[in-house]
Amino acid sequence: MGGWSIALHGGAGDIPFSLPPERRKPREEGLRHCLQIGVEALKAQKPPLDVVELVVRELENIEHFNAGIGSVLTNSGTVEMEASIMDGNTMKCGAVSGLSTVLNPISLARLVMDKTPHIYLAFQGAQDFAKQQGVETVDSSHLITAENVERLKLAIEANRVQVDYSQYNYPEPVKDDAEKELPLTNGDSQIGTVGCVAVDSHGNLASATSTGGLVNKMVGRIGDTPLIGAGTYANELCAVSATGKGEEIIRATVARDVAALMEFKGLSLKEAADFVIHERTPKGTVGLIAVSAAGEIAMPFNTTGMFRACATEDGYSEIAIWPTT
């Protein structure tokens, strides 16, 4: 086995190269801060499952990302958060969705995994379970930012839903019942879904993903993030967290497909991840982060950019948004 490795993302999408520093730097600093937390935890020999939960909790607490505080709003102006976590060693996993008051959805997903015979709890049942477990909750208004209220207003006016990091262009006419991405004003970039994957020096793997979903999504809409095999997956070969257009990720079972290509076709992590992103999903829709049991890292995307960061035990680290080659 190789040494430990970790990767995290803050969402993929049409991130304009002209993204102003005041929009870019807080997200880069957030990734740097969370990467350091993950690195220190791995150096302290914490289990990868604990590491990915810890890192995603920190990402949820940063309002510049679309998870926890700063989650985007439904078409009713409410927050509906979702998350999932998976341990590659045991294949145990937990998922939640429809959360409106839980401060850290990823930790509730972990409790579903550890404290129930189930994998997935949603809406009122998940909220009730959070109360039973003493999970920290807040008034839903605490999770709503002025920026996201404005995003929802723009989305409703344009009759569109919007995924992570959509660039602003003047809205074109929208056909009835058509679903298009919402543009944003001033070249801004939409805050993004967050995720983390990690492997320790013994090859134990884990993955975690958390999001607020789509701007102006229908109440009750569930995306890829809480779906094991779509937005999140881990086994003895690799750990994967996906980001982008949830419906496309679900159709392609993105996270599981990476593992399946490694298992059944003998592909390397990079080969499998690149194939899924560039051959199995439409251009401009999806990105992912992945680590293998040997400590390899892959962070492909077919969008303009993806907020991402990674580090390995041998000292390599990277924080990037756009393609680096």
Swiss-Prot record:
Q: Which GO terms describe its molecular function?
A: beta-aspartyl-peptidase activity; hydrolase activity, acting on carbon-nitrogen (but not peptide) bonds, in linear amides
Against InterPro entries, the record matches this protein to: Ntn_hydrolases_N (IPR029055), Peptidase_T2 (IPR000246)
* Location of the active site: T193
Expressed, tissue-wise, as follows: Expressed in ripening seeds and developing nodules.
**SUPFAM superfamilies from the UniProt entry:** N-terminal nucleophile aminohydrolases (Ntn hydrolases) (SSF56235)
Task: Report what the Swiss-Prot or TrEMBL entry states about this protein's PTMs.
Answer: Cleaved into an alpha and beta chain by autocatalysis; this activates the enzyme. The N-terminal residue of the beta subunit is responsible for the nucleophile hydrolase activity.
Cite the position(s) of the site with description Cleavage.
G192, T193
Print the keywords alphabetically: Autocatalytic cleavage, Hydrolase, Protease
According to the UniProt record, what class of enzyme is this? Answer: hydrolase
Q: Any stretches that span the bilayer, and where are they? A: none
Organism name: Lupinus luteus
Q: Which residues bind substrate?
A: R221, I222, G223, D224, T243, G244, K245, G246
Q: What is its EC number?
A: 3.4.19.5
- For this entry, list what GO says about its biological process: proteolysis
Subunit composition and interactions? Heterotetramer of two alpha and two beta chains arranged as a dimer of alpha/beta heterodimers.
This molecule's function is given as: Degrades proteins damaged by L-isoaspartyl residue formation (also known as beta-Asp residues). Also has L-asparaginase activity, which is used to liberate stored nitrogen during seed development.
Cystine bridges: which residues? none
- As given in the record, the signal peptide range reads none
Q: What is this protein called?
A: Isoaspartyl peptidase/L-asparaginase
